[in-house]
From Swiss-Prot:
InterPro entries: Thymidate_synth/dCMP_Mease (IPR045097), Thymidate_synth/dCMP_Mease_dom (IPR023451), Thymidate_synth/dCMP_Mease_sf (IPR036926), Thymidylate_synthase (IPR000398)
GO molecular function terms noted in the UniProt entry: thymidylate synthase activity
Reaction catalyzed: dUMP + (6R)-5,10-methylene-5,6,7,8-tetrahydrofolate = 7,8-dihydrofolate + dTMP
Organism: Roseobacter denitrificans (strain ATCC 33942 / OCh 114)
Protein name: Thymidylate synthase
Gene name as annotated: thyA
Keyword Cytoplasm: yes
């Protein structure tokens, strides 16, 4: 994960001080890209311990289309707690956009704690998988979480806004565009999450996982994360672990947490830091 360390150093050396929505203040660098070949191993940051349960369960939650944090809390994941309302709802965030993009406004009716929508919307993930199978040379395999009509109703507009899949010579690649990138807390999770998504997509469509390409808009380090970043940069990245899927899964929506096994992850101790809300 030297790429990640190099990105942190670039921001510290070349970034500019900026104010931000949270009032915390950042050093920001606009426009950055990192590439992680999955043939090198599964890209988990090793210079601090990551909470793997949060990464895996959050992605399964996105793919389910759910936007209430109940599932996350039931599985020991608290990373969305600060943004949820008193009922645990977040509005039409990632899962809704991935699975029901442009569904009409919610009604007053509620089923199983979830607001009912007037229209079904576009299931972008299912459409993408269908396209991988029918037109693997397509350059139109895109899923967008950024829906301007829904942004005002979201608890937090999507930071990782759009992702694209490309199949080349039997290998599947995935590129993420992230408009806003919290380099210390958020980005290590995002790298792992979308690399996991690439592995899952490749598994259910019969391709070899290729590269995860991470394109960042505003890449920033919060002012109250400086000590933590400097500590992390004193540590040396270790060899990457491997990710094993323990059973044959035919649908991406059928994966379970127990299907994933990370082998050889030997990180340095966790480094705590406050979340800017």
């Amino acid at each position: 994960m030297q790429q990640y360390h190099d990105a942190l150093r670039t921001i510290l050396e070349c970034g500019e001080e900026s104010t931000d929505r949270t009032g915390t203040g950042t050093i920001s660098y606009f426009g950055m890209q990192m590439r992680y070949p999955l043939s090198d191993g599964f890209p988990l940051v090793t210079t601090k311990k990551l909470h793997l349960r949060s990464i895996f369960h959050e992605l399964l939650w996105f793919l389910s289309g759910d936007t209430n944090i109940r599932y996350l809390q039931d599985n020991g994941v608290s990373i969305w707690d600060e943004w949820a309302d008193e009922n645990g709802d977040l509005g039409p965030v990632y899962g809704h956009q991935w699975r029901a993009f442009s569904a009409l406004s919610p009604t007053e009716e509620v089923k199983d704690g979830e607001p009912l929508y007037l229209g079904r919307g576009v299931d972008q993930v299912t459409n993408l998988i269908d396209m991988i199978k029918s037109s693997p040379d397509s350059r139109r395999m895109i899923v967008s979480a950024w829906n301007p009509a829904d942004v005002p109703r979201m608890a937090l507009p999507p930071c990782h806004a759009l992702w694209q899949v490309r199949v080349l010579n039997g290998r599947m690649h995935l590129q993420l565009y992230q408009r806003s990138a919290d380099m210390f807390l958020g980005v290590p999770f995002n790298i792992a999450s979308y690399s996991l998504l690439l592995v899952m997509l490749a598994h259910v469509t019969g391709y070899e996982p290729g590269d995860f390409v991470h394109t960042l808009g505003d890449a920033h380090i919060y002012s109250n994360h400086m000590d933590q970043v400097n500590l992390q940069l004193t540590r040396t990245p270790k060899p990457l672990p491997t990710l094993r899927i323990n059973r044959q899964v035919s649908s991406i929506f059928d994966f379970r947490y127990e299907d994933f096994e990370v082998i050889g992850y030997d990180p340095d101790p966790a480094i705590r830091a406050p979340v800017a809300v």
